[in-house]
């Protein structure tokens, strides 16, 4: 059983779809009461002690200002009390948010409903169940919340035999229960937004209808108030604490969870432990120690004169005020009377009514109905509709004790019951003909029907045992007025029958109860039974029921007969011509364009005033890890390091003598991961594992193979009618079937939509002449026909009426051009032009400050080797040096003795997963594991392969006609079909529409007369034939006398067809009949024998194309086509605007169509809709009376081009039109001839600072670097093959200096090495033991060079040595040949700006510049000579509006016009972003050299020129002075060959096995130490590379800021939203500032208002005037903005940020109380809308700025507390951020406002 099944079974037997509570009381302050509370006990007359109610002592035995204890009422199970809901709520409105307040002491351990509220259909809408687990029952009209979601307060037990004050607050979607002013529990209430509780029903106290559990206990107070906050003040204002000075009142602490869960289950709740998991927000409310109530001397109001409230002092009313402490007296609410306070005794003079004693004589269980006197006055009885869902009952739910009716009514008992009416006869079965069974859609729910007649009385059951005497019943509802009869009309309303009597066998309790409530049998009272009264008036139509669950598809019903075609409606009057609408508001801005190329940098603005320092912003999210910092300075020498790692293996020593056997060693460290072993044998299947967690949802599997065709499924129900499918491809022609038997005539199909006119068919063969048709109805006038052949001149006819206005003719040929118009007025000044071309280079600036230290230069040439220095003192022990490279493998040592067996080592760490092994053999089947939990629903798989074609299904039932489809385009002309056999003549159709007139045929030759036939009897009128063509004019008949109009005779019977008569003489021309619509196709007739060929008939005229026939019945469904190929991926759609937040969940199925509502009031004029498609021509209406001349109609749409008219005569020359609008800009004309040389221009102004350019090409070689420090003198040796790094040997003794070798060739530039400056040299590590040879590793990174080794034996002659030291200067050599170009050097540093060079030659003609800004309007020029006469101008502007003409007749609808001519040129758009840089144009031809310009100012010094050629040898100079001692002499002769040196890392080839082997024996290679200089160089290069990387892709840090958040997003798309540093002007990063980057919104850069500008609290602002700016308020100021760090933003940076921005937005939230912010509903205008001041001092409002929108406008209604959120989203960047706001709607007594300013966000 579901945990909520109690609600399903214990709800009423009707399907309870509960209406919801509606009427909102918004933001009511605690002190402000809503409507007066409803006192339930007073309304139910408790003070008169009805049956089952008695007075008792209440909650307090002692109360201040009262001698007597509180009065309460004891309720026993005999009490049966109810009342109409309207009696409690006379206004008929139940509040949407409310409080239910009661002070009760239920009987211990009970659980029953204290209150049940039903609507007029008997559906329970509201209920409060109290006891061991209180429940709040509420269901709205949509069935929400569902029974399983009813709020259950399972942790509270108020049925513990003690008094409790309980308050329930229902506000919006929560319900809060406060017990004894301390325990507060809030639960969700999932109801609708607008819910209404029906007050037309009944309220039952203490139980539910048909429920056996009754509330038993004491109740002192029971209130319902429309203020949801009243529940929180219950103990203050409604039920104050007792007087604690005397004996304390009963304990009222509720028992919490004092019963076991089993108790609940026994009580039939069956709430599982996990059913209510929502967190209950339990709040302990403060306990007030003492509360006093102020006194008053006011007299008790007259309403309560029938009873007083004890002798306590009347209460004094005070103005409410806030209670600031628990000891202050709590005020009584204003206007709050004693009526709602507790503690008073109702001392009432009871109007005692007749007590009716119920005896047991002659009263059985069926006859003990309580009868209510019908003379109680008019009162509507609200019918409870019967539902038949309840099938089982428990004995407890049967009839209990008898019920009294409402108070004061006289009651009696009688043994009478009304007779039941007889059952009607069974209706005739429906006749459903084949083809008529068409399923219609379900109709809307009909209104409630009238009450049926009473049914027959069933046979009496066995009498039950007499029950105990029941108490007097409660008063029933007043009955409706019946027609007056001799006895009074009675209303039977039983509630329970005799007490414990057993049930009679006749009818069930539910049936009897429902009969008693619904039948309203009228039984005579007093005296013998009188005649049955007349049936009462039918009750009012019930409100629409809530939508039921969707039923199953019904069987298709029969198709109804086709209705008669209604007459055409009268032509409506033409509507008045509407006033021209006001100009529409400015359109919304278009979508942001794609980001343009960066514009030229503007001039830097003046520095702004320093802003206030902002307060510290909120803690930002943790930043990204920063970049590695710069290397710090060397620290002090550290303490002695730990022993270093073992050094490389030493040389092999002599073999030692074996030592004594050692102790067993300690277990060794785990060895390295061994190689993967071979595949082991197949293991035994393991035991079944534990249930695993459900795995994550797998990816969709691959496409499975096509499955076999499944078995044929069972016959399904006919489905709903599908929408018309798309036209399938034409099927293959089938075999010709046998001629079937003639079927029965089917019903006419529904009218199909009128199709497009088909193409003209091929002329058919002559048909057999049809029977003469009866005279058709008079047809309507046809359209004007084409011009026929000249007929015989007729008699002069009477003057006809003026014909309707013809259709507009085709547009005539264009007239000749008119004369040139007068010059137009001068136009307005144009908008600001685009950005100009960059200016000339500026003058050189002042000398800048000294630059930072540059990167170290390249090392100079090797210096001469210095003399050997004195050995230094041993330095302190350095830090441990880096591990040297691995030594080469030493020779294999002798095999040692096997050591003792070590202890077993510990388990090694888990090795890395091995490579996938080969597929093992198939293992045995394992044990089945336990069933896993169901996995999540898989995603939709890929579409499967098309399955095999299934068998042809059964012929489905004919579906209902689908909705009319859209008229398709005209299909291609089909092939001419064979001439069909003639069908049976159809019945006469209704008169058809007037056809188009056919062309007049030429007169044919007269045919031969046929043979004379025998005159037959006059046959009946034949079936009407198709309308004949217009006959030839008949001979003039003799005029007859005018006869009187005779009555219409009855239609005669149909006679048998007569024989064919002879051809008569031609009759007069008949009026053309209206062609009837095409009838349904008749059944195929049997093929007749071919007749004799008749004589050649006259050539008929071309027939008029008939109207399109009705569509035939749908053919059988074709077999489904093969799946088509997948279409190509469509073009991506335009980017949509940001959508609103979607609602949860997919949309539900469409509900049933509701009943038609009452017609609404006429709506306002809507905006003109888009032009619809051309409709079909409707049927022509009857000729109406001629109307008055109308106003001229609006200009019709341009028609389709008609056939070309005959050429008209030349018209008169028209007057000259006014000048036309300027035409669109023409195409670029050809370049004109070169103009004369212009005068020299003035010196241009200083140009704006240009963009930082892309890195330039490599510059010229820089100046030579400073001489490097002297290098070590190199050994001269032959260059050996490059070997791998050798093992580091012990430091050798330094060899003797080698001779200098000749200068070597320059080497190539090396690759960058590892970054980082070299560390301090560490001390030599201790030699370690060599390891075993490992497998060849991958080539490692180039290591640093090893230390110098000892000198080896002399090698073979070396190759050319490295460069030697510089020798002394030799004699001047001869000029050498030009060397080959060296390798391109690295880019040098930027040199200083040289002096300005001489003017260069004129360069080639540059690209066409960007148009300059529009200049100011010049003075008018001198008048030119008269030009030649211009061509005829375009048509002039329209003239003034003429006087209204007379109203023309309604014209025919025009055809769809051609596309109109292009409109006038629109206003010039806003300035676009700079376009992308065009590709460079081809070099232009050289221009004519201009005249020499004025001598310009001296230019800046030029760059140093390239070195000149070496000069010739100069003449001998004078003998100089003796020089200083010279440099070392030239190199000596070659020395002995040197050792092979370790190649530098940048030059070493890849290691190969051969190289390794070739140097294995060279243990002591001497490696030159080049590492220091190289690492520094490569470190610098690497840091340069990183700097460039950071320039290209900034990180958004303080030292590496981005330009805007958009740039940062483009550089790092994966960065999260957060705070980053930006530097819009891209200068020094010292003025960067921190902003919030909203990457989610596309890379917005956001700044925030300072603390004082963030907003103001809501207040009434009594000293301020509406319509003033906030900065003019006493507490106001201009709004200012800060960065995220709280610092003011540099004005220049702000300007640059705006330059880089395409649009900006900012939100402004206005908090209000009865104050409008934007739209004012009361006035229906925006007169009181806020106004904003932009940062460009521009005022923005609703009237002048279309970029301001209200995202949410809650203040428009000016009710209660609300807010309005306004968004300014503008492309005019200077308007944002706003700096001031004007408030216009405040100053009244209840009006308040406050606001919050949001961040300003800029999007680049």
UniProtKB/Swiss-Prot annotation:
CDD domains: LamG (cd00110). It is found in: Secreted, Extracellular space, Extracellular matrix. Residues 1-34 form the signal peptide. Prolines at the third position of the tripeptide repeating unit (G-X-Y) are hydroxylated in some or all of the chains. Residues 440-488, 527-584, 567-623, 728-781, 1427-1482, 1481-1539 form the Collagen-like domain. InterPro entries: Collagen (IPR008160), Collagen_superfamily (IPR050149), ConA-like_dom_sf (IPR013320), Fib_collagen_C (IPR000885), Laminin_G (IPR001791), TSPN-like_N (IPR048287). Residues 70-242 form the Laminin G-like domain. Residues 510-527 are annotated as: Telopeptide. Disulfide bonds join 60-242, 181-235, 1605-1637, 1646-1801, 1712-1755. May play an important role in fibrillogenesis by controlling lateral growth of collagen II fibrils. This is Collagen alpha-1(XI) chain. The gene is Col11a1.
